[in-house]
Design a protein with these regions (language model features):
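Conserved RecA-like helicase ATPase core segment
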Residues: 141-253
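Conserved P-loop NTPase-based nucleic-acid remodeling module centered on helicase motor cores
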Residues: 1-53, 59, 75, 179, ...
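Short glycine-/polar-rich loops that comprise or flank the Walker A/P-loop
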Residues: 153-156, 162-164, 185-190, 245-249, ...
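Conserved helicase NTPase motor core
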Residues: 24-27, 75-180, 192-199
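Conserved RecA-like ASCE P-loop NTPase motor core of nucleic-acid helicases/translocases
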Residues: 134, 160, 193-195, 250-256, ...
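Conserved helicase C-terminal RecA-like lobe
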Residues: 73, 77, 291, 295-297, ...
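Short alpha-helix plus adjacent loop in nuclease-associated cores
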Residues: 3-13, 165-169, 199, 307-330
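Acidic, low-complexity intrinsically disordered tails
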Residues: 489-506
Length: 506
């Protein structure tokens, strides 16, 4: 949406307004900091980010500042509503003075231009006839309005979505557009895609148990092809070992957070020893703060990790340094052996043949350089160092990153759209999932959908875990775990369920 709207604004603005299009705000938080100074507020970065999120919600739901003031939103950045409104007005004033637009303004301005300028709308509709919208459950009122303006009175529209994966309501997403699609487009053909080609039967059964009876929920069925590919002939077989991965869905209880992190790390180490590949394993959690214990526990087991949502691969200093060094080396005479040439350059930067035994920054650096070496090993025969570095720079421009052989740590939100053979969903307690501040029915439903997203990331095995005690006393297992019907195994008994699906029913 944003790319198309920005392109249309830049093209038509000079004709419509008689001057160049406004610039884009490159840092909303920084501009908000300047705005807060003008109204006498002193806010830290976290508070400014909260205010930025409120501005985004207001605009994507197509509300004016006055309407926002009466929308009944929960307090943001610990500010009273009057102060929040004043700050938003100051932010908009600063933008106007600088002739700048933020990302939400791009959609608003494009929609306004199409509504006001009939010739512009006609030109856009002449150029674009057919529209396909993916992840339609996550469109906002503003995006849907823009889509209507692009379409005009035509019906050449295909949308794809899953109401059970609506997890961005806090940012303005509204699944009603998907749920009501057949009503608003009575001539539409609806195809229910209920055959699941990713996950094993135990994973699919768990997902169905979570969402059964909810609005728009599908009753998924595991594809027989997936079942045949995943179900092992040897109960101990794991993906990557030359045999199939065990299809399991388990729930394990640990006495405390440290025990949970250590137990999950040991389980992952066992999967790796059995032949699983690190990049086929993920640890998913509700909040970023939960990653530290699991990252540390995995490091203690010697398991390399990547935290999803960190720096892009080509933004890592060691990678940037390696690309520059390879580029410099590419102008010198080559030995004709690409892998040897690349390895020599990486060794000159400090890469060793074997990875560091511990985790941390050194291991991260080694893994980043090792990923570049693997790209060289996978390059077509006859590839020169110059061609290889050209391809690296093209990847750098396009953010086309190589796969790193590491276990992934990720929030549930960041994991959406991805998949792994083995998924460990951790911290499955009341207060963590659902999160403590999810109080009303709509917020709890959003948390349920987030749990569903996590469950459906798993291809073969799904491990849910929780700790019975935390820093503030005993914890209750998540209602979502209880609804799956999977029997909870205490950590000491967990070995009893390896290689198969545990009994359902507690």
């Amino acid at each position: 949406f944003h790319a198309a709207a920005l392109s249309q604004l830049n093209y038509f603005w000079p004709t419509v307004a008689g001057d160049s299009a406004p610039t884009l705000v490159d840092n909303k938080v920084r501009l908000l900091a300047h705005a807060s100074d003008t109204v006498g507020l002193r806010l830290d970065t976290a508070a400014l980010r909260d205010v930025a999120a409120e501005i985004e919600w207001r605009k994507t739901t197509m509300r004016s500042i006055e309407q926002y003031a009466h929308a009944g939103r929960p307090p943001a950045a610990r500010l009273p509503i009057d102060a929040l409104v004043d700050l938003q007005r100051a932010y908009e004033k600063l933008k106007d003075e600088r002739r700048a637009l933020d990302f939400e303004d791009v959609l608003l301005a494009c929609a306004g231009m199409l509504e006001a300028e009939k010739r512009v709308a006609a030109a856009v509709r002449e150029q674009y006839r057919h529209f396909t919208v993916d992840e339609y459950q996550d469109v906002s009122p503003l995006q849907n309005r823009l889509l209507e303006l692009w379409l005009g009175d035509r019906t050449d529209l295909c949308v794809v979505g899953d109401a059970s994966q609506t997890v961005y309501s806090f940012a303005g997403a509204d699944s009603r557009y998907l749920l009501d699609f057949q009503h608003t487009h009575p001539q539409a053909r609806v195809v229910r895609l209920e055959r699941n080609y990713r996950s094993s039967e135990p994973v699919v059964a768990t997902a169905n148990a979570l969402m059964r009876g909810r609005a728009g929920a599908l009753e998924l069925k595991a594809s027989p092809a997936v079942v045949r590919a995943i179900e092992p002939t040897d109960p101990g077989a794991v993906a990557g070992s030359g045999a199939s991965a065990p299809a399991t869905a388990t729930v394990t209880a640990y006495p405390n957070d440290a025990a949970e992190a250590a137990g999950v790390a040991r389980s992952i180490r066992a999967q790796l020893r059995a032949g699983a590949q690190p990049q086929d394993i993920a640890v998913l959690y509700r909040a970023h703060a939960q990653s530290l214990d699991f990252d540390s526990a995995l490091a203690a087991e010697g398991v390399p990790t990547t935290v999803l949502g960190g720096k892009r691969f080509f933004d890592i200093p060691e990678v940037r340094q390696a690309v520059m060094a390879l580029r410099g080396a590419s102008v010198a005479p080559s030995q004709g052996d690409l892998v040897r040439d690349v390895r020599d350059v990486l060794r000159s930067l400090g890469m060793t043949d074997e990875p560091p035994t511990a985790g941390g920054a050194l291991r991260d650096s080694w893994e980043a350089r090792a990923a570049i070496l693997r790209l060289a090993e996978d390059a077509a025969s006859g590839t020169t160092l110059r061609t290889f570095t050209d391809e690296l720079q093209a990847r750098q421009r396009d953010h086309h990153e190589p796969t790193r052989r590491t276990v992934t740590l990720s929030t549930l939100h960041a994991a959406k759209g991805l998949e792994w053979v083995h998924v460990h969903m951790v911290g499955m307690t009341e207060g963590q999932l659902p999160i403590s501040y999810a109080s009303g029915p709509e917020q709890i439903d959003e948390e349920r959908r987030l749990a569903y997203v996590g469950v459906t990331r798993a291809r073969a095995s799904l491990s849910l875990s929780f700790s019975r005690f935390g820093g503030r006393g005993p914890r209750d297992v998540s209602r979502f775990v209880q609804e799956t019907g999977i029997r909870t195994i205490d950590a000491d008994d967990a070995v009893a369920i390896r290689g198969g699906r545990p009994p359902r029913g507690r």
